């Protein structure tokens, strides 16, 4: 696979962010998540790192991995960074964590594997 120097680093940032989020919410209910502001802020910060890292991944890698919702992730970054004053829906964040991150983690593990061959 052809890639730009730095792609592997950014892919690793995505994977690390997902793993960190998973460690924060292990054995946590939605109610606990929504009421624990420190945990919520830590998860939001890692989602920002994840989204920011995907924006720095080269077009080559993005084209070779069209199943990843690159635009949606970029849009999430913009919401997390720019809409913080209006509040971010904890339910939406919880749904991303529970429904989207597991598959995203698999996809980025595959990208990492292909970049290290």
What kind of region is each of these model predictions?
Residues 1-117:
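Solvent-exposed interaction patches of small proteins and small membrane subunits
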């Amino acid at each position: 696979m052809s890639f730009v120097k730095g792609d592997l680093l950014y892919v690793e940032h995505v994977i690390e962010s997902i793993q960190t989020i998973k460690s924060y919410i292990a054995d946590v209910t939605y109610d606990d998540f929504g009421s624990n502001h420190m945990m919520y802020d830590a998860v939001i910060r890692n989602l920002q790192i994840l989204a920011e890292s995907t924006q720095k991944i080269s077009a080559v890698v993005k084209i070779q991995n069209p199943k990843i919702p690159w635009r949606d992730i970029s849009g999430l970054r913009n919401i997390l960074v720019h809409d913080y004053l209006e509040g971010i829906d904890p339910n939406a964040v919880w749904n991303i964590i529970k429904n989207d991150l597991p598959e995203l983690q698999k996809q980025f593990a595959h990208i990492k594997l292909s970049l290290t061959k």
